[in-house]
Amino acid sequence: ALDFTHAAARKVKTPKYLLGQRDKYTATGIGLALQYDSRDFAPNPYRGLYLNLRETYFPAALGSTETIWRTTFTGNFYQRLWKGCTLAFDAYMEYNTGKEIPWSMVAQLGGGYRMRGYYLGQYRDNGMIEVQAEFRQKIYNRHGIAVWVGAGNVFPSFDRFQWRQTLPNYGIGYRWEFKHRVNVRIDYGRGKHGGSVVFNVNEAF
């Protein structure tokens, strides 16, 4: 697989946030992925297992500003408990190594799929681990709800991982099935310093 990224910061009001790095970076990578997927329906699984391990190499020889290795792992498990109810688990890890990881390439915690309640990039570092468990229940006709709990952590390296910096996450959501097994979701997630609302199509994972 090929991966290309170009990022440029413009009109930076607080240059110190760049930590002395350049205001633009380019990265071109080649990668290899191993995947196993037994989900019954990817956009809204009721049962099954999804595993994906990906390694991507961004060498200077391909035009990358910095030479970087990126490892990502996704593990999802789904189990039907009773009629209309699914229990879903999600685990995600991203780890970037190199002499210097550009601000545009670090792992970013938050967003509309994991750690809902934190905006994307609210916490960022070379490495990130996130886990969540979600209970999904259809209530009546096309209407349903979801509740979840989760946690996440960012860290510069595995040997500097600190449990006390783990961030909590929990929330509740409404589901409307606008066609068979395809949901519109409205989620309200809470984090350490507040919350946010997410509107999207299909489940978070």
Label each region the model flagged.
Residues 1-4, 49-57, 73, 89-95, ...:
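Transmembrane beta-barrel strands of outer-membrane/channel proteins
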Residues 1-26, 30:
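Transmembrane beta-barrel domains of Gram-negative outer membranes and organellar outer membranes
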Residues 8-18, 49-57, 107-116, 151-154, ...:
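Flexible, solvent-exposed coil segments and beta strand-coil junctions
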Residues 136-167:
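C-terminal hydrophobic structural anchor segments
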Residues 20-23, 30-35, 39-138:
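C-terminal outer-membrane beta-barrel translocator/porin domains of Gram-negative envelope proteins
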Residues 41-43, 82-87, 141-145, 176-184:
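Repeated loop/turn-to-beta-strand initiation elements of outer-membrane beta-barrel proteins
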Residues 31, 112, 172-179, 194-205:
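Outer-membrane beta-barrel "beta-signal"
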Residues 6-14, 45-47, 63-69, 100-107, ...:
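Outer-membrane beta-barrel translocator domains and adjoining extracellular loop/strand segments
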